[in-house]
């Protein structure tokens, strides 16, 4: 018995398969580059920039290397900051469970009126966090305000995928 499928049905089936496959790839891409939307109600500092209140997209610049975060506006049209990070494993299972699948940000404590600098970002599905490396001058300012050590670098993430890490 020979089955004849109309061209319309074949095109529809192909379109459904392509749509499903592309949706799956987009979902995997968000996991690979750790694409995360964060909304802040007040200004915050990231390495190399102070972000006004608003929504931002944080993502890994190169998933193959995973040493640099990028921060974009909510529409991902403008790159606002690009900086190195180092992994940290200081989050407990209980903390991960309390996050309920949402990203968690830890800030350096600063005096009132000073935009708090982001210290660690925990991606929802990863028990390890990402400690942000601040440019040396900015790290020295943060350390002076917080009286705490701050991880810093004198490396440029636009020129290298490797960072020289120091504590100030």
Please give the residue ranges for each predicted region.
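Sec/Tat signal peptide C-region and signal peptidase I cleavage site
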Residues: 21-27
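Bacterial N-terminal signal peptides that target proteins for export
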Residues: 1-11
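Compositionally biased, proline/threonine/alanine/serine-rich low-complexity intrinsically disordered stretches
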Residues: 138-168
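Short acidic, Pro/Gly- and aromatic-enriched capping/linker segments at domain boundaries
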Residues: 27-45
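A short tyrosine-centered beta-strand micro-motif
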Residues: 54-60
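Mid-chain, structured segments of secreted extracytoplasmic proteins
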Residues: 66-120
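Bacterial N-terminal signal peptides
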Residues: 10-19
């Amino acid at each position: 018995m020979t089955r004849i499928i109309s061209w319309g049905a074949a095109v529809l089936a192909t379109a459904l398969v392509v749509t499903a496959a592309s949706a799956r790839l987009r979902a995997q891409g968000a996991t690979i580059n750790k694409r995360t939307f964060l909304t802040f109600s007040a200004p915050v500092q990231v390495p190399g920039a102070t972000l006004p209140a608003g929504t931002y997209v944080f993502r890994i610049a190169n998933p193959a290397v995973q040493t640099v975060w990028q921060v974009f506006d909510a529409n991902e049209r403008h790159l606002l900051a690009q900086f190195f990070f180092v992994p940290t494993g200081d989050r407990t299972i209980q903390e991960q469970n309390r996050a309920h699948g949402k990203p968690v940000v830890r800030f350096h404590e600063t005096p009132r009126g000073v935009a708090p600098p982001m210290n660690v970002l925990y991606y929802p599905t990863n028990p390890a966090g990402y400690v942000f490396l601040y440019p040396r001058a900015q790290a020295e300012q943060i350390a002076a305000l917080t009286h705490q050590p701050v991880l810093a670098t004198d490396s440029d993430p636009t020129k290298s995928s490797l960072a020289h890490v120091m504590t100030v």
